[in-house]
């Protein structure tokens, strides 16, 4: 007996291939996209513009399965954090950040993270595996259903758990669905992928996907970046910065956004700002300064408001479009760098971290009843 297929795990070309294999015209793929993603219907019997024989055919050959909601927390500022349970019982976190006329969904790409950035809670939890397409787009599907009016997803950022470009195929396929007119219909300007700098995958992404790019920079030189982002030892700034400079054509008016976490006494001095100015001198870019969000066991501390203000002014005086990202959801451990999830670490990294600190920092998350 042929194993049933989860339609949520198919890219648009794969869905069209599945439809063709069922002897159906290709427009059926469009209908299924609309039913599943726009209307949120997973029961084939309710897809009323499909013939009854085809609905029966679908139920025999396929299904639609999304992750399950395990827990939810809502911040005092309106930020939502969800813990989603996967089929293998690993759990990931997804965050929704409302802000005036926009609502940003922060989506995870891995169970844990394959990288081990020193300032990020996710990295300390270790790594289990890449998420499937169904598990990535399923976060968007679930969030759209869970949010109550007036909340609405207007932007998606691949900035949750994991390094997106180490899960390239599934992430790019998911972003394509986010932008598809018959799925979520988001503009390419409203879907952003954030990377720590996986150079080969960045080059490929530039050719294959029109999404906006953000780069986790966090340091103005290799010596410091090697400490904060160990990946820099493989892909250093002399490779990363030229690629960012030429990532978008000069005539497009688009540019890379650099993310820079502000850590007291480490990368927040005036000398660091001046070094950053020299590093990015000819790079069309925007800079987001991110106040460091603490997590249990870290020795890092957030820069003072005064230090952040001086750093920002120095960059702006040099002509850089620089903003300070407002911290959201930190009271529910939903802010940048705080996501942890609950999963089996296959690397042993979390246990080594626990032994080093003398505590287990895998935080329990109180539930909200549904």
UniProtKB/Swiss-Prot annotation:
The active site is at 93 (proton acceptor), 336 (s-methylcysteine intermediate). It is found in: Cytoplasm. The keyword Iron applies. Its cofactor is [4Fe-4S] cluster. Signal peptide: none annotated. S-adenosyl-L-methionine binds at residues 162-163, 194, 216-218, 293. It is an enzyme of class 2 (transferase). Its EC number is 2.1.1.192. GO terms for biological process: rRNA base methylation; tRNA methylation. Pfam families: Radical_SAM, RlmN_N. GO terms for molecular function: 4 iron, 4 sulfur cluster binding; metal ion binding; rRNA (adenine(2503)-C2-)-methyltransferase activity; rRNA binding; tRNA (adenine(37)-C2)-methyltransferase activity; tRNA binding. HAMAP family: RNA_methyltr_RlmN (MF_01849). Belongs to the radical SAM superfamily. RlmN family. This is Dual-specificity RNA methyltransferase RlmN. The lineage of its organism: Bacteria, Pseudomonadati, Pseudomonadota, Gammaproteobacteria, Legionellales.
